[in-house]
């Protein structure tokens, strides 16, 4: 039992969520609320990052489950939180040092079906990215018109000294307001008309995304050097993250495919043949021969009918089938046929009744029955401590 569920609620998962479920939840939410896509959702993005930072760490998660957010803030497992952007970069690839040398990576989520991952597919993805302005060649203005900002001397930062007491000063660093942190200044009349002095422009890019057989939900496809461009930096990457939709029949478990199959009692006892449509539009027939009893909950498999193995597409996992046996309704047989059926089935064990035994009857289980009894019991106890007046009839 966890003390509080706030972090789990932020990610939209249950307290018993696996690491894979946590990763999938973070991936979807982080891409949705990233400041580049939702500039007004900075606080939400921060909450998502903090929740994932704690729950993805086994020690921090254990501490949180026992003591809640207060236990984390008190520093029992390292204390404090990392930068939301650092967590995002570590998850999707990249990092601070990389960002200093290269332009920003662009991350896009691509929705795919289980059929796409089974058969392979090609998708065209249209997106917007920053490219260096070709009109001014990334200068922001005419040749010779760009000058070093005299206010910050080209650093893009201002340092102010603030005296906070006798003999005590505080050094405060802030973005230079004169050049907006660029370290350069361009006269408005000399600014490039195409990019308005920003050195970059937005451009539409069409990417052809090849989804190989056997790729997995959450797998990344990286287009190196196709990300945002910035003057003086190497272009970043475009990272495509595959997001698999749920399938109506099959569930993927690693290289295996899992499904449930309903069969009737006669099929469970006497054998059956069941067709299954595969993800590559073939039909395979599952056969159980007479005399091979299939019990409710039995799990069997078909070799080499699961998912193709990534980069080894001619090898496949297993198709795993869990059987659900449907029993007939009450009274489906007349008494004489029921006697005949009993003779055909294995003999049942008779119970020798004694005087010490009590006869009881089976009834259908009602999960709400105990709840109602508990509620009524509390009501009776309440009446004992707080007697209520009887209902009076109105008299004329």
Swiss-Prot record:
Q: Please list every transmembrane segment annotated in the UniProt record, as residue ranges.
A: none
Q: Where in the cell is it found?
A: Membrane; Cytoplasm; Microsome; Mitochondrion
- Gene that encodes the chain: DNAJA1
User: Where do the CXXCXGXG motif repeats lie?
Assistant: 133-140, 149-156, 176-183, 192-199
Q: Which organism is it from?
A: Pongo abelii (Sumatran orangutan)
Q: What protein is this chain from? A: DnaJ homolog subfamily A member 1
Q: State a single Pfam family of this protein.
A: DnaJ
Pro-peptide positions? 394-396
Q: Which CDD domains match?
A: DnaJ, DnaJ_C, DnaJ_zf
Q: Describe the location of the J domain by residue ranges.
A: 6-68
């Amino acid at each position: 039992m966890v003390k509080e569920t706030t972090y789990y609620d932020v990610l939209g998962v249950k307290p018993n969520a696996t690491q894979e479920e946590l990763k999938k939840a973070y991936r979807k939410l982080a891409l949705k609320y990233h400041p580049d896509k939702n500039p007004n959702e900075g606080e939400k993005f921060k909450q998502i990052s903090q929740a994932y930072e704690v729950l993805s760490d086994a020690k921090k998660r254990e501490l949180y489950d026992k003591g809640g957010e207060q236990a984390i803030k008190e520093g029992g497992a390292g204390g404090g939180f990392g930068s939301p952007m650092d967590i995002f970069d570590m998850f999707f690839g990249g990092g601070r040092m990389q960002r200093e040398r290269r332009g920003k990576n662009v991350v896009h989520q691509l929705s795919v079906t289980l059929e796409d991952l089974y058969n392979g597919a090609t998708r065209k993805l249209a997106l917007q990215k920053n490219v260096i302005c070709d009109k001014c060649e990334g200068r922001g203005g005419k040749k010779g018109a760009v000058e070093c900002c005299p206010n910050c001397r080209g650093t893009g930062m201002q340092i102010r000294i603030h005296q906070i007491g006798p003999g005590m000063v505080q050094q405060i660093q802030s973005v230079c307001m004169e050049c907006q942190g660029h370290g350069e200044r361009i006269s408005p009349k000399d600014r490039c008309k195409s990019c308005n002095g920003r050195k970059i422009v937005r451009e539409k890019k069409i990417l052809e995304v090849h989804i190989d057989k056997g790729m997995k939900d959450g797998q990344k496809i990286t287009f190196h050097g196709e990300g945002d461009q910035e003057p003086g930096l190497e272009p970043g990457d475009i990272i495509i993250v595959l997001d698999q939709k749920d399938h109506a029949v099959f569930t993927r478990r690693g290289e295996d495919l899992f499904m449930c199959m309903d069969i009737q009692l006669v099929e469970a006892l006497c054998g059956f043949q069941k067709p299954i449509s595969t993800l590559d539009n073939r039909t395979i027939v599952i056969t159980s021969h007479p005399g091979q009893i299939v019990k409710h909950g039995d799990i069997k498999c078909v070799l080499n009918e699961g998912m193709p193995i990534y980069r080894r597409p001619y090898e496949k996992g297993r198709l795993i089938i869990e059987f659900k046996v449907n029993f007939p309704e009450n009274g489906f047989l007349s008494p004489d046929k029921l006697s005949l059926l009993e003779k055909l089935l294995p003999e049942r064990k008779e119970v020798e009744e004694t005087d010490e035994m009590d006869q009881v009857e089976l009834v259908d289980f009602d999960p709400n029955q105990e709840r109602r009894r508990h509620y009524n019991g509390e009501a009776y106890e309440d009446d004992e401590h707080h007697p209520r007046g009887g209902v009076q009839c109105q008299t004329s």
